[in-house]
A protein has these predicted regions:
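Hydrophobic/aromatic beta-strand patches that form the interior of the parallel beta-sheet core
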Residues: 30-32, 62-64, 115-117
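Catalytic cores of nucleic-acid endonucleases
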Residues: 36-88
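Conserved catalytic cores of phosphodiester-cleaving nucleases, focusing on short active-site segments
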Residues: 20-22, 30-36, 53
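Active-site metal-binding core of divalent-cation-utilizing nuclease and nuclease-like domains
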Residues: 1-26, 40, 106-108
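Domain-level recognition of nuclease-like catalytic cores that cleave nucleotide substrates
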Residues: 68-123
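Hydrophobic anchor at the start of a short beta-strand
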Residues: 6-8, 61, 114
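Short His-Asn-centered micro-motif
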Residues: 11-14, 33-34, 64-66
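Residue-level signal for short segments within beta-strands and strand-turn junctions
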Residues: 22-24, 65-67, 120
Length: 123
């Protein structure tokens, strides 16, 4: 499916603005949040922020994290993977920096599909 003219950025959604929002048939087909890596605590906050933007109908979401400063990208990958192993109901490693996860939202008692992607953009 192609989402021509259905994608917006910085879109108001529930509680705040999401970075990437794709609408299909009057529903959110995808909600994405982009962050700069600032440690695992900020990563957890970003997951909660993503959940805050989604409603009970929204099941396809993504957190995209960019590393700008940490020269040891492998340590970031390990931190995130450890968090995923501890918090995801299910997960699949797509490659060393992308995971497909099912996370449980306590507030709605629903499972949400979250793609987590890390990208190293250090110079």
């Amino acid at each position: 499916t192609h989402y021509v003219n259905m994608t917006t950025g910085e879109t108001f959604r529930k509680v705040g603005k999401t970075d990437i929002h794709i609408v299909f048939e009057n529903k959110a087909a995808f909600i994405g949040e982009c962050k700069i890596w600032n440690g695992i605590k900020k990563f957890e906050e970003a997951i909660e922020q993503l959940f805050g933007y989604s409603t009970w109908k929204d099941t396809k979401t993504a957190l995209i994290v960019f590393n700008k400063e940490n020269k040891n990208f492998a340590s970031i990958q390990q931190n995130v993977f450890s968090w995923i192993k501890s918090n995801a109901k299910r997960y699949e490693v797509k490659n060393g920096n992308i995971w497909s996860c099912v996370l449980h939202r306590e507030d709605t008692n629903l499972d949400v599909q979250v793609a987590i992607a890390l990208y190293d953009i250090t110079i």
